[in-house]
């Protein structure tokens, strides 16, 4: 699918998404993969990729998920990279049937990843659909932009792991979201939580100081991952090794667990 084109400038009001009823969800894909980001890199996980996102980050590596998808591509069988298609929207019983082959006892998937797009844009659907998914006995791992505070509150009891972004304006090309990130992190704290920061050659020291200070105010033991840019869409210049070393030291002045981890699935040529 070709990258979605937005009529909004970076940092402007949220891009309008197709209205989705609570009993229905817009899902772009369901598939098996090796987690390539964050502190659980290397684990086998089942991914549910939601369609639609309110942001237009310059470094976005999944522009096809920025807008609602016409069809949901379901890997069949899991791990084959062969897909069948079902029409959107996807009702909760359809989702339950789609994930069942991925979550059999011999599938070795450690958790179910909700990714996007922005899964919390469909919080009402998550409240309806996740209980049946959780019944398979796997943890639910939420990947999110870290800004939809009320939506997180509404589904937090159904989530086990929160992997949230912090979005430096000097990386994203958008307006600052620090206040939302701070409140979101506070709400997420009862769960296992990690923070991901995509960094480019233009990422600024003041922005990284904001990340450091917000996380340290909430809990200095929270893991923070500096993720070097994988060239994509509007961002092409990766940070230098010297920058990454300096930035890790800057955050480590107040934080206990700061790591530099690239997108490992991209190195493998995977989804």
Regions found by a protein language model. Name each.
Residues 2-3, 50:
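Flexible mid-to-C-terminal extensions adjoining Fe-S/redox cofactors in radical SAM and related proteins
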Residues 3, 14-31, 256-271:
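Short, basic/aromatic-enriched C-terminal tail that caps enzymatic domains
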Residues 3-14, 25, 59-158:
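Conserved Radical SAM active-site core
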Residues 13-18, 35, 213, 246-250:
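Intrinsically disordered, low-complexity boundary segments flanking structured domains
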Residues 21-66:
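N-terminal pre-triad scaffold of radical SAM enzymes
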Residues 108-111, 119-271:
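Conserved AdoMet/S-adenosylmethionine-binding subsite of the radical SAM
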